[in-house]
Amino acid sequence: MPELWLYLGRQTGRREFFLPGRSHLWQIARKKVNRARMQIFYSGRVQGVGFRYTAKSVATGFEVTGTVRNLPDGRVELVAEGAKDELKAFSQGILESGLEHFIQKEDVSWGEAKNEFRGFEIVR
């Protein structure tokens, strides 16, 4: 798998190669600058229509981490972290996935990333 090897060359011409482990790659991802946290509460007919599954599927196309879960009051809560532009595109991707017909209201709030997620998961 040569595509996984990282090149650590210097201007001196000396080349070093290494195969990073998962923890190393995760540390690199967590150090990205301009990371933000987006929390969205979706209202409408958003439970029982595959909303969480679709949100997780859409998340695979973006560099975001987070969770999506049903709330007892009938809403769905989505919390995601990543670059702000990526988060905006992700939320737009959710709307364009066919879920916009079920959403009556979308309450979005922004904050600083807490780096508490690994991947994107459905919370049950």
Feature annotation, model-predicted:
Residues 4-124:
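Intrinsically disordered, low-complexity, mixed-charge
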